[in-house]
Amino acid sequence: IRDRDNAILACHPISGNANVEEWWTPLFGPGHVLDTSKYFIVCCNAIGSPYGTLSPLTRKGGEDVSGGTWKCSPHVHAPDEQTEQLWWGPDLPKTTIRDDVRLQKHVLDFLGVEQLACVMGGSIGGATSLEWPLCFPVRFPSSPDALVTMTPEQKPYVRSIVVLAASARHSAWCIAWCEIQRQAIEADTRYQHGRYLLRDPPSGGLAAARMCALMTYRQPHSFERRFSRLRGKSNMTSAPKDSQASTLMEEGGDGDFEEDVAKIREPQAQEQYAVQSYLHHHGAKFLTRFDALCYIHLSDKLDSHDVTRDRASWSQDTSSESAMLKGVLRHLGNAPNSPRVLVLSVTSDMLYTPAEQKAIHDAVPASKLVHIESSEGHDGFLIEYPQIDRAIREFMERLNVSHNPSAL
């Protein structure tokens, strides 16, 4: 870790995992943002993710996920099975993004990281990035929720953050979409109040929830441009044999979007519209790598996101939500040694709108706002790699955020 201050913490999207090189591949390598010859890259699975750390699939007192294959072991939640009592299942307490931040801090302490060069992420990962310097302005704050007024001689724990396609709080619009997805899962008769057998999960509900989510990750123009009213292959509803290869390229799990459309255009079965085939294909594809309870846990976590929660005392003006937001976020830029903040906004994002990124930028003194031009909606944060790579590299180069901290 060199001088123990060249670490970059990457925070994954909701359906991602700790293998950041898998879902942000174009940002890796010499000359790119995640250059391992310069930086020590760290990524931790969020609590609730089925890929590790802690989730409804976790044994009470142990772990049930194979990090080598990223596949969940076929254990049970159901009370009629003797082994059920060993697994958290629906009994796992709800967690927040701040819980993830605190757990990640323990990992970084274990690794010996004394200062983070940057925390970056998109979507829920961007929300995590925003929480990081609020939770840990210094390495060891007096209490987890303490407001630390930085003095010039203090060393910030986080030197910079990149907030990509995220908001400072989960909006009513986003909460509503998450609730629709949860209801789709819970309406499946196999759900059994969360005490289902993993060999007989609520597949229909989870697939429907994923299809609903896909609609929020894109926007109407991109669907019309690709599908229009074309008819497509009915066998697109089945998951491909190698469904792990490209599932994490985009938040929507459809890194092979153009390839899928090309397949749909083949003059074969005409039973479905192409867009129906596309949605069913990716709904089924999601079932091979995710668990319904994990999905519900993570969506609940998203809903809890609000940087002003339990921080009313941080703001001098509590007359409105926007005033409180500004009052809390101003602490990210009110001192010479405050973390530098880059906010990236996808111009066509209908989930976390550009107005929400502008609100962050307006509230944080000396922050920088960059618009990522894209017609792909929210998924643009995992598609428009050249723009994103360039914006972050220029940001870090200007600040000289590297293994040499003397520039700051």
Give names to the regions the model predicted.
Residues L147-K285:
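Alpha/beta-hydrolase-fold enzymes
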Residues R2, S15-A127, L134, V138-A168, ...:
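Gly/Pro-rich cap/lid or specificity-loop segments adjacent to the active site
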Residues L287, M350-E356:
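Conserved alpha/beta-hydrolase "acid-adjacent" motif
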Residues R210, D291-L293, D300, H331-V341, ...:
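Short, proline-enriched alpha-helix->beta-strand connector loops that line the catalytic pocket
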Residues P354-Q357, H361-G377:
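Catalytic histidine neighborhood in serine/cysteine hydrolases
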